[in-house]
């Protein structure tokens, strides 16, 4: 089948979670094909290497697409010491799909 680009959503940590000392940021890429996809996390422009967990769903029997959720886990202190959080999703040779948020806007 033809490649299908994902729709990408980025979810900041909840205020409730931050009070517990942890900050979980979730980037979701929905309905893409083929399954070859790369997620890159950046914090204030710096690529993150640790604290990342990816989970991909099996191929959907309805439309043969895949979905992926990528979670970046930080402490509240780490989270509060930075501003811009970015999730970049790259599929094959397509240009990256970028979602980001500014902590101050949340």
Swiss-Prot record:
The keyword Amino-acid biosynthesis does not apply. Residues 48-64 have a biased composition (Polar residues). The keyword Disulfide bond applies. Residues 48-67 are annotated as: Disordered. Gene3D superfamilies: Immunoglobulins. SMART domains: IGc1. InterPro entries: Ig-like_dom, Ig-like_dom_sf, Ig-like_fold, Ig_C1-set, Immune_Resp_Modulators. SUPFAM superfamilies: Immunoglobulin. It holds the Pfam family C1-set. Disulfide bonds join 27-87. Residues 6-99 form the Ig-like domain. Keywords: Disulfide bond, Immunoglobulin domain. In Basilea rabbits, the major type of light chain is lambda. The kappa chain shown is a minor component. All other rabbit B allotypes have 'Cys-64'. In rabbits two Ig kappa light chain genes are present, C kappa 1 and C kappa 2 or K-BAS. PANTHER family: TAPASIN. This is Ig kappa-b4 chain C region. It comes from Oryctolagus cuniculus. The gene is K-BAS.
